Structures are given as C-alpha cells and as structure tokens.
Regions:
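Long, terminal "pre-/pro-" and other extracytoplasmic accessory regions
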Residues: 1-276
Length: 276
C-alpha cells in the first residue's frame, strides 16, 4: 500500500469514528424511545404516606401511643374530674405539644389491620380476655355498633414517621349520655393489628378496696408482653384527678419510659388503666 493510500485509510477511519461518536448516541436514544413513546405502560407505586412500617416491640408501641395521647385525648370522666381539680388547685392545663401526633386515619384500615366490621367482635374478645385475667370484673357488658363509636387513629412520631401505632378508639356514643352506664365500657384504645387493649375506662360494681392494682398490672403486663414494671411515685399527686390510684413504670423507647396508672373514680365506680 502506497503512502497516499495509507493516509486516506487513516483519515477515513478518523472520520468514521467521529461520525459514530456524534450520531451513534442520538440514534440509540431514538431506537429506545420507539419502545416507550405512544405506548401505555403500567407501573406499581406506593400511595403517599404508605411507606415501610417498622416493627416495634410491645414497649416501644406503648411508649409511642402514650406520648401521642397522654394529654391530648381524655375520657369523659377524666375531663370532668380534671376540670374540677384544676379549678380547685389553681392549675392551668395545656394540650400536649411536641413531635408526636395523634390523627384520625380517614383512609381506613390497610393491610392486616382490623376492619370496621371486625372491631366490635375484636373488642368483645379483648374484654373476655381481660375478664379471664381478672383485670376487669365479669359483669362488664359487651360493646355493640348501636351503642358505641369506633374510630381509627394513627399515633405517629413525627420526627421518625416509621415509628407509628394504629389503634381503634372504642367509646360509648354521645347519644348514650343519659343511658345507664353501670357495668359498661366507657372507652378503650385497641391495637389495630392484634386487638390488644392498651387503655380502658369501665363502670363496674367494684369499690376501691376490692381492686388489687399490683395483680392487675402484673396480669396486664404479661398480656401485653411488656415485662415486669417498677412502682412509680408521682412527682405531684395533685395532678391526679382522683385520690385512688397507683402508678407503674415500664421501659419505653431509648431513654424514655411509659407510666401506667391503675385508678378508680369514687361515686361512679369507674376503674381505669391509662398510659402516659
């Protein structure tokens, strides 16, 4: 091959490389676009807010729920008593503020959560278990859709949204205010996954002297899978809405802890177990 021929061969190769480098990517992109454009495609995406749900243990779930509802939502009996004691003690109560939210779940149950149709049966099953454990007396009546309202809530750690607990709140309907409340559940918080009862207020025929708080908290802790609690002395007994109570403390999340109170309202014969 002559020197001139080799020169033209090299020049042709260079031109070819430059042409491919410029035209090649554009041609490849057009080829790929043909398989995408003007054709319907289906892509499965997660709904907003429907992310990975972190599996918390029983103590962590109790702690998150307690932080969310501790001072935001009070039972009818506690609201009345709190108003009375606050007025007499000259105390000013404000709603709990911070990085925890307790919000109604308007989109309803998801996944394996207990449904609207199942919650009344689930609550009655929970009451049956509490009676068997002697946490509640046998004469507490079952709930039903005609007399009770069931509302689904999410208790959320705003800074760590994966830390959330979904619960049903079961409460005696406002239309039942003038009804006989003896031996009836007033309200309760029920886990939307396993149906366990976190907190309850119930009218009974018991008196404070009939109630063994240590036995109740031991049985309830075992039922919830919480481990053994420690006794807790209230920093300020005046903040309580009844003189009849005993407090216990459970490990929470991180350095946090959950206070569980077993108490009693004299006059209306109402026993309660609340978390805070």
């Amino acid at each position: 091959m002559t020197k001139t021929a080799r020169y033209f061969t090299v020049l042709l190769t260079v031109v070819l490389v430059i042409t491919v480098s410029i035209w090649g990517p554009e041609a490849l992109a057009k080829y790929k676009d043909k398989g995408i454009l003007n054709k319907p495609h289906i892509e499965v995406v997660m709904e907003a807010g429907e992310g990975y749900r972190y599996q918390m243990n029983a103590n962590e779930k109790l702690y998150i729920l307690a932080r969310c509802i501790g001072s935001q939502v009070l039972s009818e009996s506690e609201q009345n008593a709190l108003t009375f004691y606050a007025g007499n003690a000259g105390l000013d109560y404000e709603d709990l503020e911070g990085s925890y939210a307790f919000v109604r779940k308007y989109n309803g149950p998801s996944g394996k959560e207990i449904t609207d149709e199942q919650i009344y049966t689930t609550c009655n099953e929970g009451l049956r278990v509490l009676k068997e454990l002697n946490i509640l007396p046998q004469n507490v009546n079952d709930v039903n859709a005609a007399s009770y309202n069931a509302t689904l809530y999410s208790a959320i750690d705003v800074l760590e949204p994966r830390n959330n607990v979904v619960v049903w709140k079961m409460e005696l309907s406002n239309s039942q205010k003038n009804a006989d409340k003896e031996n009836r559940l007033i309200d309760a918080y029920i886990d939307a996954d396993d149906g366990k009862i976190y907190e309850f207020y119930a009218r009974t025929s018991l008196f404070w002297g009939d109630i063994d708080t240590d036995a109740i908290i031991e049985a309830w802790a075992d039922y919830m899978g919480l481990g053994t609690p420690s006794a807790y002395e209230s920093d300020n007994p005046l903040l309580e809405t009844t003189p009849y109570f005993k407090k216990y403390v459970f490990p929470g999340m991180g350095e946090g802890r959950t206070i569980v109170t077993v108490g009693y309202y004299e006059g209306i014969n109402e026993i309660f177990l609340k978390i805070s």
